[in-house]
Curated annotation (Swiss-Prot):
Main localization of the protein described in the UniProt heading: cytoplasm
A GO cellular-component term linked to this record: cytosol
GO biological process, one term: arginyl-tRNA aminoacylation
Molecular function, one GO term: glycine-tRNA ligase activity
Protein name: Glycine--tRNA ligase beta subunit
Organism encoding this protein: Dichelobacter nodosus (strain VCS1703A)
Catalyzed chemical reaction(s): tRNA(Gly) + glycine + ATP = glycyl-tRNA(Gly) + AMP + diphosphate
Length: 689
């Protein structure tokens, strides 16, 4: 099979930052899909992206489609010939649709009679000839939120396209799209290599562009940024703070990244470090520098998109830009310190949280009520919770948070400490939002845990009540994150909250017209759905989680203890046999009904059933005690000891015997066992694990 390495590059105007990686990655998957569907053998597909291009390289691409064997079933022979043995219109029409004479059709004999069959072969087309249609399909399916048109081009794209490179090894394949024809030329760096770049071969793509001051691979640029930035940070006596998201964003803004250090006035360090870091990272796309103790240093590192002839001018330019941003933040900080958080409470009455859910003040009161009730479960000081909940949203009206919304909670903590509130109350003002992302830290204080749980209960009920349930990629109120955060809080902080009654309490805080109480079970179901995702990420088999959830438990701490006991038990020697027996018991009782009568020992006839019942009676009280104490590992070990007696029972005992009394007694025995199993989980669900 002849193969080539195919390179396709779309040269564009400056792309949106997120589009660089998102469209490159999505395009690689789409190319794999369309080539596979078109029966075109191919190897690895690589994705490339810079601010001015998207590209894909397909290795070991067959130059021709795979030939296809075709078989079509036509009319029955009875319908294909008339009484004179002449071909009917049905037969002639079928032959014509296959492009052959009717005499060329085969006759196949089956159990249902004889049928006309067409067998043929469709020769694969040259991939070069198919490329325009394949390319169009990929372009149409790229996940571009907003497409634009330019000039008289018939096709829309994320940004205007200026050139199209299509190379099969070192040969240009013809393709015309976006109003431009394919060629072997790419774009070099806008400043360092303004003239077009000739790509010699699909395999020399990276090297040819690097010679033109373009690092086309995104991860290579990320690595270069990491190395350069940390090297400069070391020279400054520190270490750069390098969030992965910022590294990737800067890599998507540059084609030839060059790190440059800058400095700012030490007086700005009097502000909270989060303010400076947020300004540097989120607004200036620069990296902060910390010392070995984690203290912020008066430096930053920017990444330029070129090698400047006058690096000092570039440094001064960056310093000139960042200085007024810090000065503004310093002004906000000083102004905010003049007012206690209580002063902002009246303003919350005028701020709409959500049209149907009321003002921020109303949300504050709802959360405050729930949080104060929760103190009985979290052992948090009720007065501290009351104060923290009352002031929870006050910092949203401060000048700093109005300018930097991402600092909500953080500034609340600083302002609370400044006005002399307790450290735990201050910390809770920040912790109410924890965790802020998947895998993020949880609240550490009892007050923070309490406030965070109350906040999430209110947000989930409110979101569902206004029809804002997460769907696909849409989650405007971050309810998915809220649910996962609530799950982590309850489980990892061991808060034995019962979901249903507490969701009902939260729903009861909303005005009746909203009908929030009607959504309690929907929210509960959604939380349990996210709970399954929580365990999937920990590589716990879904069947184990489903077995526990089948008991309809409401306490996530208890559910977690059962899941974590079942997971290792399922890998034990006894588990496979035991689970199979549990499923067999479930099926027998489902078909024949459970028996609530007591087991009569005088009706136990076979040695296997006598032994099984004896084993069960010996362990039953210990099993109940272990379950009552939440010691599910011990309980499962006890149940696991029944694996062999159960095997012997099903091998030697006929449950549905002709003697009705014995039959009922055996069903009663199985009913007792099933009730015991269900003290932990519906073990029959995991029989196929």
């Amino acid at each position: 099979m002849n193969t080539v390495t195919l390179l396709i590059e779309i040269g564009t105007e400056e792309l949106p930052t997120r589009a660089v990686t998102e469209l490159a990655s999505a395009g690689a998957q789409l190319w794999d899909n369309v080539l596979t569907t078109a029966l075109i053998p191919h190897g690895e597909i690589e994705a490339f992206g810079t601010p001015r291009r998207l590209a894909w390289r397909v290795r070991q691409l067959a130059v021709k489609q795979t030939d296809q064997k075709i078989e079509r079933k036509g009319p029955s022979l009875q319908a294909a010939k008339d009484k004179n043995n002449a071909w009917t219109k049905a037969a002639l029409g079928f032959a014509a649709s296959c492009g052959v004479d009717v005499e060329q059709l085969a006759i196949e004999t089956t159990e249902k009679g004889q049928w006309l069959i067409f067998r043929g072969e469709k020769m694969g087309e040259n991939v070069a000839d198919l490329l325009p249609d394949l390319f169009a399909e990929v372009m149409d399916k790229l996940p571009i939120a907003k497409r634009m048109r330019w000039g008289d081009c018939d096709h829309a794209f994320v940004r205007p396209v200026h050139n199209l490179l299509v190379l099969a090894d070192d040969n240009v394949w013809d393709l015309e799209f976006f109003g431009v024809a394919s060629q072997h030329l790419s774009q070099g760096h806008r400043v360092h290599h303004a003239e077009p770049v000739a790509i010699r071969h699909a395999k020399t793509y990276e090297a040819d562009l690097e010679a033109a001051y373009v690092i086309v691979d995104h991860e290579t640029r990320c690595n270069r940024i990491r190395e350069q930035v940390q090297a400069l940070a070391r020279d400054l006596g520190g270490k750069a703070l390098m969030p992965e998201a910022l590294v990737k964003e800067v890599a998507s803004l540059t084609e030839w990244p060059i790190a440059i250090a800058g400095a700012f006035d030490r007086s700005f360090l009097k502000m909270p470090p989060e303010v400076l870091i947020t300004t540097m990272q989120d607004h200036q796309k620069t990296f902060a520098v910390m010392d070995t103790l984690g203290t912020l240093l008066p430096y930053f590192i920017a990444v330029a998109n070129l090698e400047s002839r006058n690096e000092e001018e570039v440094r001064k330019g960056n310093e000139k830009v960042i200085r007024p941003r810090f000065a503004d933040a310093e002004f906000f900080w000083q102004q905010d310190l003049k007012r206690p958080l209580e002063d902002y409470l009246p303003q919350l009455e005028r701020v709409i949280y959500q049209e149907k859910l009321g003002t921020l003040a109303e949300k504050t009161r709802r959360v405050q009520t729930i949080a104060c009730e929760l103190t009985a479960m979290t052992a948090a000081d009720k007065n501290s919770v009351y104060t923290a909940a009352r002031l929870a949203k006050s910092d949203l009206q401060t000048a700093m948070v109005q300018e930097f919304p991402e600092l909500q909670g953080v500034m609340g903590r600083y302002y609370a400490l400044h006005q002399g509130l307790s450290a735990e109350v201050a910390q809770a003002l920040e912790e109410q939002y924890f965790p802020t992302a998947a895998g993020d830290k949880l609240p550490q204080t009892a007050v923070g845990i309490t406030l965070s749980i109350a906040e999430k209960l209110d947000t989930l009920i409110g979101g569902f009540s206004i029809g804002a349930q997460p769907t696909g990629s849409k989650d405007p109120y971050a309810l998915r994150r809220m649910a996962i955060g609530l799950i982590r809080l309850l489980i990892e902080k061991k808060v034995p909250l019962l979901l249903t009654p507490w969701l009902e309490k939260a729903a009861g805080q909303f005005h009746d017209a909203l009908g929030a109480k009607n959504f309690v079970m929907d929210v509960r179901a959604y939380i349990l759905e996210r709970l399954q995702a929580y365990y999937r990420e920990q590589n716990i088999a879904p069947e184990i989680v489903q077995a526990v959830l089948a008991l309809n438990g409401d306490n996530l701490v208890d559910i977690d203890q059962r899941v974590r006991a079942l997971a290792p038990f399922s890998n034990s020697d006894a588990a496979l046999s035991f689970f199979a027996s549990a499923k067999r018991i479930r099926n027998i009782l489902k078909k024949n009904g459970t028996q609530q009568t007591a087991v009569r020992t005088d009706l136990l006839q076979e040695s296997a059933e006598k032994h099984l019942w004896q084993q069960w009676e010996q362990m039953h009280n210990a099993l109940l005690a272990a379950v009552s104490a939440g010691n599910y590992e011990t309980a499962l070990q006890q149940l696991g000891s029944l694996a062999e007696p159960l095997e012997a029972f099903f091998a030697q005992v006929m449950v549905m015997t002709e003697n009705p009394d014995v039959q009922i007694n055996r069903l009663a025995l199985l009913t007792a066992l099933q009730k015991g199993f269900e003290l932990i989980a519906d073990l029959s669900i995991i029989s196929n694990l």
